[in-house]
Design a protein with these regions (language model features):
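Surface beta-strand/loop "capping" patches
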Residues: 347-378
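Exposed aromatic-hydrophobic patches
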Residues: 396, 403-413
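Short, hydrophobic/aromatic beta-strand segments
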Residues: 183-189, 350-351, 380-384
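A contiguous, surface-exposed recognition patch within enzymatic or periplasmic domains that forms
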Residues: 2-5, 9-26, 61, 68-71, ...
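Short, aromatic- and glycine-rich surface loops/edge beta-strands on solvent-exposed regions
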Residues: 383-384, 412-430
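Extended, loop-rich substrate-binding clefts of extracytoplasmic carbohydrate-active enzymes
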Residues: 26-64, 112-169, 199, 298-327, ...
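Asparagine-centered strand-capping/turn motif at beta-strand->loop junctions
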Residues: 176-183, 372-374
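Beta-strand-rich binding/interaction modules
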Residues: 367-397, 419-421
Length: 431
């Protein structure tokens, strides 16, 4: 195995300037921001932007293994600015080639692209501000970039570690949020990966998601085929709102509930996608946001990028399934959680994913389509497909896959009511 590489360098990125933060305190007790408090003291607010673009130098930290390459920008909130799939030679999160802020964030400036980490509320107050960082090497050849800060509104501390391991085609993210105060504090955590929009985009929600909510659960729609009115759009003819091209206005939707640990997006015109994996018991939030496939959405595209086109926000919530919704930290309490972001290819719309593998099993005009994509090495495994209630397997083959590779096929001439697909090895079932 090749050890993970980590390095620091200055990178030059075309950047649009902002005005200065207001030096005067703003006691905005009655300000409402995205359904929650807009009070930001002791932070200052920036309310001016510039059309002046310069080539600006930014501190970047890179992680790279045999499968993916990731760039983190500590000077912009510690966000993942770029994530590159080395196997498919594609950005598996939306890469904005310019830093072009708009007044979207809690303190004003906010940029699209990459993976943003929203806390203690969204959009993160320090999303356009620097954070501390350090590097950690592991005995197994893995490398971690830690970023962290103490935010000033609630006095909470956060540390987030971005880890690549030599034998895994996934970015592992481990976070710790600590309340060092003598009284309870509240916070939320929504990771916000951006993915490419356009005609080829389709969101990949788990198969048990049949309904989605708006913010505050104030409106509901069937999913993926909407059949009523949602965001004042008439979908009564039956419209697949998992497709970017079918959503004409700015729209949020969040899964009502799911027993699955994944959510993602598939790009039909690139044969590649992104998946997020986390324990659904603590990470139930699964959301899509779009500016809409219309002139209004195109205007926002131009406000946030020069040439990279539309994007989708595919937000993933910890301790919350809707926005705004908060969890509590008791005095001196710490909460920890893990998330995984990974590229995949070949399988298209998938039905399950874990930290080690991605599964496809669906009916189509071709028959029963099945597939398996490896995130970690799958050697000495078997893949079995069975009809529930019957002993004989419809498929039972040996599997030997290296990370970032896939196998797939079609079962013809059968029409079972319910099927199971299970990869397993000497150590048991895949996690």
């Amino acid at each position: 195995m090749t050890p993970v590489k980590v390095w620091q360098e200055r990178v030059e990125i075309p950047t649009y300037e902002t005005g200065p933060q207001d030096i005067h305190p703003m006691f905005l007790e009655n300000r409402v921001y995205q359904g929650s408090s807009g009070a930001v003291y002791p932070y200052g607010v920036t309310d001016t932007l510039s059309e002046q673009k310069t080539l600006k130098s930014w501190q970047a930290v890179w992680l790279e293994n045999d499968y993916i390459k990731v760039m983190i920008l500590p000077e912009l909130g510690g966000r993942v600015h770029r994530a590159w799939d080395k196997v498919k030679q594609r950005d598996f999160v939306y890469h904005n080639e310019v830093i072009k802020p708009a007044l979207v964030g809690l303190l004003g400036p906010w940029i699209s692209g990459g993976i943003e980490f929203n806390w203690p509320q969204h959009h993160r107050p320090t999303t356009f501000m620097p954070v501390d960082f350090t590097l950690e090497a592991h005995e197994d050849g893995a490398q971690t970039v830690w970023v962290g800060e103490t935010e000033s509104m609630h006095g909470l501390q956060v540390m987030t570690g971005f880890t690549l391991r030599p034998d895994r085609a996934a970015l592992e993210i481990a976070s710790r949020v600590y309340n060092g105060n003598a009284t309870p504090r509240h916070f939320l955590w929504w990771a916000n990966p951006a993915v490419k929009g356009g005609e080829g985009h389709q969101s990949v929600f788990p198969p048990d998601v049949t309904a989605v909510f708006d913010h505050g659960k104030r409106a509901v729609s069937a999913f993926p085929i909407a059949t009523g009115t949602y965001y004042k759009v008439d979908y009564s003819a039956g419209v697949d709102i998992s497709r970017y091209k079918n959503v004409p206005v700015p729209t949020s939707y969040m899964a009502e509930k799911s027993q699955y640990d994944f959510v993602g997006a598939w790009c039909h015109d690139e044969d590649g996608g992104l998946l997020h994996v986390a324990n659904h018991h603590i990470a139930p939030g699964k959301k899509q946001w779009s500016w809409g496939h219309s002139e209004f959405g195109q205007a926002w595209d131009k406000s946030l990028t020069d040439n990279n086109g539309p994007y989708i926000e595919l937000m993933t919530g910890i301790f919350a399934d809707n926005q705004p919704d908060f969890t509590w930290l008791d005095a001196y309490e710490e909460k920890r959680f893990e998330q995984y972001f990974l590229p995949y290819h070949s399988l298209g719309m998938v039905q399950n994913a874990s930290r080690d593998a991605v599964i496809k099993l669906q009916r189509s005009e071709r028959g029963i389509e099945w597939g398996l994509y490896a995130i970690s090495p799958l050697n000495g495994y078997r893949l079995a497909i069975r009809e529930i209630g019957k002993c004989n397997a419809l498929l039972d083959d040996g599997v030997a896959l290296t990370p970032a590779t896939a196998i797939q096929g079609v079962l013809h001439g059968i029409n079972p009511e319910r099927l199971t697909i299970q990869p397993s090895g000497a150590a048991g079932h895949i996690r």
